[in-house]
């Protein structure tokens, strides 16, 4: 972290933070707390993946399943109904449902080859959505006037970067996101369960 004390952190007029850690550790939990303060812009990499990059794929998957049901098939073909994704920061089920689980189709699984194909698509989408952090860091200040920016990264960030490569495209993009203006201080926080407990007890960043 670039801050050597809580006082240094609090004195920063504009903060840019990237949270990273395994899925379920509390990145979105913390981001939601900050967003509700109305001073932080919350950028969710997973939400971006499930909307811009894989949104159409997700809906097409739902439609393909619906076409197996005669009643739904009839209504889809004559445009009587439509199917869409209701993905949100808090509900990423459409994305996880699309990725699926390899296994017996009769038990809700998908063929392993199809699973790998979807994982490859997600990998590419995750790279694109993470690189987009810089774009939204600009938007947060330039369009919406937010003082602070928090990037809620995906749980598999470590799988799309090479920390030993100084020219890694994703890491360079993240670095740029936090060096756009000299006004901004930045840091990256690795979350562990203790951090989430700290916030749940009513403490503030």
Where do the model's predicted regions map?
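The conserved Walker
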Residues: 23
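Conserved glycine(s) of the Walker
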Residues: 26
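Hydrophobic positions on the alpha1 helix immediately C-terminal to the Walker A/P-loop
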Residues: 30, 34
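ATP-dependent small-molecule kinase phosphotransfer cores
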Residues: 54-164
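ATP-dependent NMP and nucleoside kinases share a basic, alpha-helical "lid"
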Residues: 134-143, 152-204
């Amino acid at each position: 972290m670039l801050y050597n004390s809580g006082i240094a952190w609090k004195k920063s007029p504009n903060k840019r933070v990237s949270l990273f850690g395994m899925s379920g550790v509390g990145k979105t939990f913390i981001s939601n707390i900050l967003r509700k303060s109305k001073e932080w812009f919350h950028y969710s990499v997973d939400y971006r993946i499930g909307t811009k990059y894989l949104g159409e794929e997700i809906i097409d998957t739902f439609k393909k399943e619906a076409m197996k049901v005669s009643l739904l098939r009839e209504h889809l073909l004559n445009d009587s109904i439509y199917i869409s994704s209701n993905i949100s920061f808090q509900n990423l089920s459409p994305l996880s449902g699309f990725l699926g689980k390899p296994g017996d189709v009769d038990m809700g699984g998908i063929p392993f080859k199809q699973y790998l194909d979807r994982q490859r698509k997600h990998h590419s989408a995750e790279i694109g959505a993470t690189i987009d952090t810089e774009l939204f860091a600009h938007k947060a200040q330039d369009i919406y006037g937010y003082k602070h920016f928090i990037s809620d990264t995906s749980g598999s960030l470590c799988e799309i970067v090479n920390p030993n490569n100084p020219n890694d495209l994703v890491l360079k993009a993240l670095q740029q996101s936090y060096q756009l203006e000299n006004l901004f201080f930045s840091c990256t926080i690795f979350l562990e369960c203790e951090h989430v407990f700290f916030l749940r007890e009513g403490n503030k960043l």
